[in-house]
Amino acid sequence: MAQKVEAKGGKGGNQWDDGSDHDAVTKIQVAVGGMGIQYIQFDYVKNGQTEQTPLRGIKGSTIPTDPFVINHPEEHLVSIEIWYKPDGLIQGLRFISNKKTSRFIGYDRGTRSFLQVQDKKIIGFHGSAGDNLNSLGAYFAPLTIPLTPAKPLPALGSDDGTAWDDGAYVGVKKVYVGQAQDGISAVKFVYDKSPEEVTGEEHGKSTLLGFEEFVLDYPSEYIIAVEGTYDKIFGSDGSVITMLRFKTNKQTSPPFGLEAGTAFELKEEGHKIVGFHGRADALLHKIGVHVRPVSN
């Protein structure tokens, strides 16, 4: 949810509010008059589409300064220096992104302040305006850090069944393991796709024994390893997964199934598990994982 920071400046003019449902600010146009900032205008991007706001203030006979362009998504607006008269108008502005700073626009008179929030970016504005810009406030959203690409660790078990792959996500929130008489019958996972929660498909075939659930204290808890065993069973040419156990940064789950056959561990040091893949038919024959660095 966006954080609204109150407007700086005077109390006159008509209230306006661009809202907080934008992805980013991409351009700012400002004009200066004899009494201060004459008007301001913003371009936003939302779902890949550019939106331009009306002028906040009036155009008059002023000549606008060169626009401050923000090259989204690599660049974002993080701070604005504001000079204002508490009983009057916005006097001067300077815009600061994570990559550059605009020249100062207007007059350095009155009270100096900043619109900024640590580790957040500006995604919208509000304020008041009449014949000039009276006040200016902003909406802030958390900075989104691009995820390091995930990498798959090879699946272990046998090549029976059909291949499946849930892909890689931000994290794993829940694990469901179904059991059969001879091994693991099915698995299903709930993932964080930020901001949505995604429930993966059921891999294998559930039985009357149903599913056992392992719930993580997400996001502070994450899976760092999967331990298990696989073995050949009567009537099957290949092996089936007979037991699974999930290790997190806080705990180890109970074993799901019966420990029998060849033991294995899926793990990469300094990484967390963010997705699963494998092979299955009526039973789970093979399981592998996708991992990302824990710093993500």
From Swiss-Prot:
It comes from Arabidopsis thaliana. InterPro entries: Jacalin-like_lectin_dom (IPR001229), Jacalin-like_lectin_dom_plant (IPR033734), Jacalin-like_lectin_dom_sf (IPR036404). This is PYK10-binding protein 2. Keywords: Acetylation, Lectin, Repeat. Component of the PYK10 complex, at least composed of PYK10/BGLU23, BGLU21, BGLU22, JAL22, JAL23, PBP1/JAL30, PBP2/JAL31, JAL32, JAL33, JAL34, JAL35, GLL22 and GLL23. The gene is PBP2. Residues 1-20 are annotated as: Disordered. PROSITE patterns: JACALIN_LECTIN. Gene3D superfamilies: Jacalin-like lectin domain. Polymerizer-type lectin that may facilitate the correct polymerization of BGLU23/PYK10 upon tissue damage. Activates BGLU21, BGLU22 and BGLU23. Residues 2-142, 150-293 form the Jacalin-type lectin domain.
